[in-house]
Amino acid sequence: MSKKTVLALGLAMQGLCLAGIAQAEAPQPSQAAPAQTSVLGSPSQIAFEKQVLRVIETPVMQAEIQRVKALYAADPQGATPAGKATIKRAAESIGVVAAQYAVGEDTDRPGVFWVVNAPHDWFGVHSPRSGYGIENPDNVYRNLIVDGAARYEIHGRIKQPAPAEQHFELRDSIPGTAALSPEGGKQLATLSNEQLQVADDGTFTITLDSSPANGRANHMQMPPEGEFLLIVRDLFTDWETQNPVALDVQRVGGPAIRPLRTDAQVAQRAAKLLSQLAPYWLNYFNQYTYPGQPNHIKQVRVRPGGRGLSSGGYFSLPADEALVLTLDAVGAKSMGIQITDPWGVAYEYADRISSLNNAQAKPNADGTYTFVIAEKDPGVFNWLDPEGHGGGLFAIRWQSVPQGVKPEDAIRSQAVVPLARLREVLPAGTHFVTPSERQAQRAARAASHARRLQ
């Protein structure tokens, strides 16, 4: 029996009645036992995840996570049913993120580490949920932290079918540790798959140092002093076939190598980072999102560095209402919508459907896409599942967008409607599902997400 079959059967055996679910059960982590040739499951990645687990369990980190819970509880969102119910998951999730950043800060022994991901079990390691800042379920996120005084080479190999887009973004700091801004920090350099020079066998090399390119292809220049964050995003539209790009990094020059840090030192750094990240993202949403009207899409904006368009908002719905959004892909290679808890941590997306992209969703007859956000399953294929909660954030991203697109064309309509009238307002030909079909949809999604562990 294949791993995918085991995963799908495990989901089916949960016996969930998906129609009219009022409160979600705790999501189960993706299960996989990938071979040692796993693209993401390298020995360095597994060692990284083990150290993250050790750091999270230290008293200093546990104390800081408790402070984050208190911070969230004191915020206005902490008084809402959805906000109160998700404080623990959100605080623990961003705590894992802080530990990931801290462990990855060894610029003398660098690694391109998979981060900000769903709970998963592999190689005997259980990694808990890590997410914040409305992480995109369509992305495989990897981080590399580098020293401006050193020189690095990133070696990659693309396996077809490749991601719909791969994007390397060099930032001046870890998002959430600098001044508040719409992008969470300053972008220093970018490199996308459209610019990347790749050999016939799918391999490539990226150089990263403080010198100009001087004729070098695939070069990213950084300032000569300080530590900087390289974020790598492999964007999947087709979870069932697309593969992450194999990446490895070597430090090829720089100052003398410093001694290894102890877990205690890393934990102190992680706690400091968490004390910055949690208030930052709380302030971020309180400044940029929550002052707007609920259940309303904000004006679509152009993102820097050729990263397309984005918009979003927040929803607050009673159990008998739904938010109906109709979007235009405007020719983008990828258009995706997702929902998160009120703190910006994605609702469960490995085996529930809290996100959909234009390859996963069912289109309308005119090529647009209509999505439904509702606490209870309305039986619509394009339903976004908030795990039984009536509130949270939503984000919409259009990536690899053609030239000349008008951002205002991307939103067709939005409305809050009673669930009793939902079928009246949905476009003709809307794809509906039975509870058993929903279960099959979820099982297929879980199997496709588990490919990331293989």
How should these model regions be labeled?
Residues 1-23:
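Gram-negative bacterial Sec-dependent N-terminal signal peptides
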